[in-house]
């Protein structure tokens, strides 16, 4: 091999290694809460002033609220999908915000609500089942043929039976309908090409089958996908991820459930009978998004909140462990935890912790959990101060600490 060829090969190896590292170093940031739509002047404009701070947390992706016109102000009862004038701001405001995040090398993830949809008009029978897409042509202008025939609240539907769970607040859309598949796929691609979105968060993904989600993912080719399957059964989540394929991941509700109970004096639960983590990260860490709270479980809804005095123990866990961690807006800005969260995220980045990093659980007892991640980081959570001799090897130094948590990293990095 010639000198120049060897040099080129060496450079190629370096570039490929860097690309692989960047692809693995992912932190998702949820950029809204349940009350964000109430912000005076619009949430999108308000968020322009937060881009720099969000970037400083180490976030690589930001999850934004549902983009379309909606009957509910929060965006989860969408109607005219192409109409981007919502309670969060205008389409122009949204596009400008996405560009601002892109300027900081942060990819934007759209909250995609396609299980159900609200109609604009009644038909001749007086039933709300006539949809308008928000354009001057007939794209997404649907009727009873596009509603599931077994919808319990809108039984006037003439489509196929639902492929997933029902949703009472709005008509369930027939995802087996070729027109629905074609036009929703076109809309998703429009969100990518016209707005600049790079990925999808699939709302209420239990409402339609993984096979249907796969169609939209395959047709729109997002770089990032995470499904919301509000369930503690990790087998259900694993089956969905495998069924969708490609870049699909799922929010790790099993880990949230176990962790928020374990930090209250039952940390022995953080090691399963197989010696691995008990949540989805114990099975498919590269396909898992871990989180502490979101706009449903926390915020003002508080449907399933993490213990408020132990939130930072939760972040010490997810930000140093396998999986893709998700940081919640409220904790950074409303709870004033930005400094502590950023310190943990920095440890993650500096040590190259990625979704598939190795996890060696050293201790999992009532008031103590200790684990080594990627061979470079050791994390302790729990109230016990004395963790025992020889647990922390020589050559490790404290990198981040707070109330009942501490993180060490190898010296000399």
From Swiss-Prot:
Ca(2+) 1 binds at residues 115, 162, 172, 207. GO terms for molecular function: alpha-amylase activity; calcium ion binding. Coiled coil: none annotated. Binds 3 Ca(2+) ions per subunit. Ca(2+) 2 binds at residues 132, 135, 137, 141. It comes from the Eukaryota. Ca(2+) 3 binds at residues 151, 167, 170, 172. Keywords: Calcium, Carbohydrate metabolism, Germination, Glycosidase, Hydrolase, Metal-binding, Signal. Monomer. Binds starch not only at the active site, but also via accessory binding sites on the protein surface that are important for efficient binding to starch granules and thereby increase enzyme activity. PANTHER family: ALPHA-AMYLASE. Belongs to the glycosyl hydrolase 13 family. This is Alpha-amylase AMY3. It comes from Triticum aestivum.
């Amino acid at each position: 091999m010639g000198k120049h060829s060897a040099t080129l090969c060496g450079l190629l190896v370096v570039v490929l290694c860097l690309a692989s590292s960047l692809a693995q170093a992912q932190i998702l940031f949820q950029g809204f809460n349940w009350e964000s739509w109430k912000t005076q002047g619009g949430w999108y404009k308000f968020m322009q002033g937060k881009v720099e701070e969000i970037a400083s947390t180490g976030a690589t992706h930001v999850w934004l609220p549902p983009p379309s016109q909606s009957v509910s102000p929060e965006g989860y009862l969408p109607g005219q999908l192409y109409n981007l004038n919502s309670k969060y701001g205008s389409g122009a405001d949204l596009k400008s915000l996405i560009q601002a995040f892109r300027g900081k090398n942060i990819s934007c993830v759209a909250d995609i609500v396609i299980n159900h949809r609200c109609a604009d008009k009644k038909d001749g029978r007086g039933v709300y089942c006539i949809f308008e897409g928000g354009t001057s042509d007939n794209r997404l202008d649907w009727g009873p043929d596009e509603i599931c025939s077994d919808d319990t609240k809108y039984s006037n539907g003439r489509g196929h039976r639902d492929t997933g769970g029902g949703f009472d607040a709005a008509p369930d859309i027939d995802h087996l309908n070729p027109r629905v598949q074609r036009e929703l796929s076109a809309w998703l691609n429009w969100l990518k090409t016209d707005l600049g979105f790079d990925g999808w968060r699939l709302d209420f993904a239990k409402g339609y089958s993984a096979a249907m989600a796969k169609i939209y993912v395959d047709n729109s080719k997002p770089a990032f996908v995470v499904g919301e399957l509000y369930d503690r059964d990790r087998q259900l989540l694993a089956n969905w991820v495998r069924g969708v394929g490609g870049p699909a991941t799922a929010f790790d509700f099993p880990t949230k459930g176990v962790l928020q109970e374990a930090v209250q004096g039952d940390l022995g639960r953080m090691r399963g009978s197989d010696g691995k983590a008990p949540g989805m990260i114990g099975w498919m860490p590269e396909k898992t998004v871990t989180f502490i709270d979101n706009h449903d479980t926390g915020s003002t809804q508080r449907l399933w909140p993490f213990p408020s005095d132990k939130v930072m123990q939760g972040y010490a866990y997810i930000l140093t462990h396998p999986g893709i961690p998700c940081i919640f807006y409220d904790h950074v800005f409303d709870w004033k935890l930005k400094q502590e969260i950023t310190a943990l995220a920095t440890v993650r980045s500096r040590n190259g912790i990625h979704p598939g990093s190795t996890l060696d659980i050293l201790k999992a007892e009532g008031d103590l959990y200790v684990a080594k991640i990627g061979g470079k980081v050791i994390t302790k959570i729990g109230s016990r101060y004395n963790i025992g001799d020889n647990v922390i090897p020589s050559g490790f130094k404290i990198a981040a600490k707070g109330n009942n948590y501490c993180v060490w990293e190898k010296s000399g990095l």
